[in-house]
Each structure stands twice: as structure tokens, then as C-alpha cells.
């Protein structure tokens, strides 16, 4: 059994004190949590410092906290911010570890079976293991996750019970330790020392935990007793210090012991027999043969190796769950009284609701045609009501809370006033007739003042046509479409801020991360066309893009006033009035946010350049030169991973593997 460390409080490190609306919001949220309120909403306007408020709340209530974001990009940003706020506590990152994922599927109309194909990102896998091990070892944990946290993960009890606990002076033979490591899916490799592997040199065993990336452990034996445990650099073997206790968690989240494995296999065989009878009774002989062949192969692999590709499809039997019972997820690794914070809840809660149905439709086809046993349906994401059953206390965070959140609670804490004194922008409506000439005039005014412009359209064609028109008029403009990758997107935003171009056009510019203080004008074309991007929430989010500049202004081009437009304008005016009154009372003059232009791109490019240089010359290198190149590339890979640029980290990893294969 694992002993958690002594209770450790969260320690928030920041050069700022709460200001504006933050003190009252923090106090209200904390009082509600300590008073036992199950659900509440933090309605925070854009730029009011919601993440800082969330951090203050976490530090005051001292509960393990799960922060859920609706995509990897936003989760990465939040992870970076929380790491800065809590350098002495465990801040973890838990998102899907696939760089590429093609799920297993079957298309009956063309009799096409698509085998599961995926590429696992080693860095993210390491971070996932770090998250689960931290949750089992300590209490001061913040996990920033995407909706991947509601997918099946394996039993936390089996994961914890399988952990190998080691101390100096403990009586255990070297061979007993080796057997224990193999049982928890560690792989012996005396040459290529990586995460989830161990190597043996006489009476010394070196183990590389699945949750680490640079540090491993050296266990030295004296007879059948552990003499010493040392922490070492995995690459150089340099000793970093002695350890008085080491807990090695399994190298995979799906793990079970021998006794449970035999019980699981018996259940799989019983289910297989039942399903074969059903297929044969229906005359589905091809499906029966297919299912028998695939399942018996998997059973043999489970018996011999304790693991098989697609083991998650048998997780119901491995975990000892009943049919239809929800799978274990990351949420089960938390203690009962943990806190959940849902960032951009109007988006995230919709994702949580939609995950289950899409997954079931695909898997049902595999079951019907004999590719999987019916129990595979229980390897799934949680339904929304199952997610709700895990909730002890929850805070929904959004500038525009959705209907679902509003139905869950009447407790709404507003955070309207910005620490900078910035006001919500003025909004005006202009007719669409002659909008191009009118817009061009407004853009030129901003260019003269050294400011930037966002334009949001409804269709790709209109965005492309408008881009061409503005280019012909001599405007430096770019169009950001959905095919652009994360790194390119970051580069475009950076170039806009630096003034490489002055106008950015897009269909959905209300997405997270598009916060550019230099933008003083947001133009919304076809504002009267009701729909997802032109409903009240969409309009408020888009209006918020101009709230980082003291001269922020929004123009809606429309031929009529829709209910959504009116509500968005009224809400913006309400917030603006509150902000103006606060500024007047406290003598605050709004100042445009001074935000550093983070040079993520140049750092990534420097790493990329080193990788390219090594790739160009490695064939002519000597063996020792290649070893040096590998060391440098591994450092570059870590650098890219710390910047959360996992695509680049994966490319560097592949190059390292190529170099190693040459020796």
C-alpha cells in the first residue's frame, strides 16, 4: 500500500495581488465551497484574470483539483500558467497521448475493416503517468486535463496495489525485484534505456519510471537486501542523490495481477462462448469464425505477456465490472472531496455530453460484425450523468455560461472589472450596404494609429474574397482557416502583434488563445444571420476580442437587429457601465494591456534547426559523434516538450531512434 506524503498546502507564487473584481470573486467562491455549495458559476468577462482567480481559490480551499479544458491547446496554456503559480506543488497535464489516432472501425456497405492505427506521443504518456502517480502519492495536486479525462483508464486500485515499494534495508532478492518489474509491464533492455524499462548489471538494477523523463533510479543489492537506492541522470548515469523510499508504478494504466488475470480470461472465454452461440444460431458463421480467431489470439497474449494490443476492450472483465457499469477514469484517481473547475464551460460541457454517443455507434458496428465482444462497448467515455456522479464540488468558468450550467445552479459569481481598468468595447450596428468601403476606411484609421483589426465572416468563400479585396487595396492582411496547425496559428498571432500584417480575417475568431492587445477593432459581418457563430454567446465572445485595448471598438454589419444581437449588446453595455463606475470611483484610467510577445516560435525553430543539422550530417558521423548528437537531440526534445510543442518533440524522438538504429 502507498503512504501519501504528509499533508502539504498549496503555495501560490505571484508578484500580483488580487485587484478589480478579483477579491470579491475569490472570497465568494471560497465561502461557497467551504459552505458545501456543490455547483457555482464564475462568470468572468474576457481579460479579468479568471485563471488567477481560480489559482487563488485552489490555494485557499486546499483540495486536489481537476481543471478541464475543451482542447489540448487551451489545456497547455492553463498548465503553463498553473505551473508558474504553483512551482512547489504538483501541477500535472493529462490529455490524449495520440499524435495520430485512427480508431478501429467497420464499414458494412463496402465490407471494409479499418484496423486501429495510432502514434503515441511519449512525452504526453509520461505526463499522464506523472498525473496518476502524483494523485496516489500526494494531496497537493492540480491536474489540467482535456475531455480525455472521462475515457477509460484502468482501475486505480489495481494500479496502486501493483506498485512496487522499495526502501534501503528491505529484504528482497534481485530476481524477486526483476519478476515484480516484469509483472507491472516494465521491459528489460540493457542497451536502450528508456521510460518503462530497466537494465541489470550484476547486483545493480537501474529502473526508469514511466512518469519520469530525465531521472532514473539505481538499486544496489547486498545479497538479498537492498543496500542503497540512488537517483541518477538517465543519460549520463550521474548520481543526483540517495532516496530513502521509491515507489514504482506500473508502466501501463491497464494492469492486473495473475489471479485477477485468470479470472478475467475465464470471463472473456464465457462471453466468447455465449456470443459464438448467438452468431451460429443466426447463421452468422463468418462473424463467429472472425470473433473466435481474434479473441483466442488476444487470450493467448494475455496469458503469456499479461498484455495485448487493444487490451482496453477487455477492461470490463479486467476491472471486474458488470455490463453497462461505467469504466474507471482519471476522476477515480482523485479522493472523494476533490474540486472540479470547468474552463470555458459553455464549450467543455457540450463536449462531455457528446463523447459517449459517437463512441457507441462505432463500437456497436464492430460487435455486430464479429470484430469485438459486446463487452468492448463498456470501454467508453462516461455519460454526462456518470460524470455528474463523480462531482463533489464544481466551478463552471466562462464569460458566457451555457444553458446546462445555468440549470445546475443559481449561484453565480461575477468578475466583470479588469485589474487594468479596461472597459468592454463600445458596440455599434451599421448597415451591410456599402460595408466593404466603410470597413476599409475603419481599417485605415487603425493602421495610422499602429493598431490591428479582426474581421469575422460566416463562410470560407467570403473570408477568401475579402482577403483578396483588401490585398488589392494595399492592406497587409491574412486569413486564418481551420486547416492551420497550432504552431502556425501561434506564429500568425505573433506576426499580427509584431505588425508584420495589420488585419486578420477568420470564420471563428472567438476561439481560445486569440487575445491580442493590439486589436482595437473587431468587425462582425452578417451579424444578423442567427446561428452558432451569431448567437448571443458567440457574439459576446467575439466582442471580447476587442476588450484588451483601451480604444476597443466593435462594428456589427447587419440589416436588422436580431434578439441575439440585442442581448449581446445589452450585456456588453451592462458590464461597461459597471466597469466605468468602478474606474470613476477609484480614479483608474484604462490602459491597454502590455503583454509580452512570447518567442515560442523562435525557440522551436532553433530546436528544429538543430534537428535538421543533425539529420543532414549523421550519415558521415563516427559512432561517438552520433552519440553526442543523440544527447543534444534528447535535450532539444525535452526543450520542445517543456514548451508543450509535442509535434516537434515527436519528430525529434523519431530522429533519435533513426540515429540509434545506425549503431
Curated annotation (Swiss-Prot):
Tell me, in a sentence or two, what this protein's role is.
The UvrABC repair system catalyzes the recognition and processing of DNA lesions. A damage recognition complex composed of 2 UvrA and 2 UvrB subunits scans DNA for abnormalities. Upon binding of the UvrA(2)B(2) complex to a putative damaged site, the DNA wraps around one UvrB monomer. DNA wrap is dependent on ATP binding by UvrB and probably causes local melting of the DNA helix, facilitating insertion of UvrB beta-hairpin between the DNA strands. Then UvrB probes one DNA strand for the presence of a lesion.
What the entry lists under PANTHER family is as follows:
UVRABC SYSTEM PROTEIN B
Return the domain comment text from this UniProt entry.
The beta-hairpin motif is involved in DNA binding.
**UniProt similarity note:** Belongs to the UvrB family.
> Cross-referenced CDD domains, in alphabetical order?
DEXHc_UvrB (cd17916), SF2_C_UvrB (cd18790)
Pfam families under this entry? Helicase_C, ResIII, UVR, UvrB, UvrB_inter
Which Gene3D superfamilies does this chain map to? P-loop containing nucleotide triphosphate hydrolases, UVR domain
Does the keyword section mention Cytoplasm?
yes
UniProt record, GO biological process: nucleotide-excision repair; SOS response
Residues of the Helicase C-terminal domain: 435-601
PROSITE patterns per UniProt: HELICASE_ATP_BIND_1, HELICASE_CTER, UVR
State the GO CC annotations: cytoplasm; excinuclease repair complex
Q: Which HAMAP family match?
A: UvrB
What are the protein's UniProt keywords?
ATP-binding, Cytoplasm, DNA damage, DNA excision, DNA repair, Excision nuclease, Helicase, Hydrolase, Nucleotide-binding, SOS response
Q: Where is ATP annotated to bind? A: 44-51
Enumerate the spans annotated as UVR domain.
627-662
User: Could you tell me one molecular function GO term of this UniProt entry?
Assistant: excinuclease ABC activity
UniProt-annotated location(s): Cytoplasm
Q: How does it assemble?
A: Forms a heterotetramer with UvrA during the search for lesions. Interacts with UvrC in an incision complex.
- Keyword Endoplasmic reticulum among UniProt keywords: no
In its UniProt entry, what is this protein called?
A: UvrABC system protein B
All copies of domain Helicase ATP-binding, residue ranges: 31-271
Q: In chain numbering, where does the motif Beta-hairpin fall?
A: 97-120
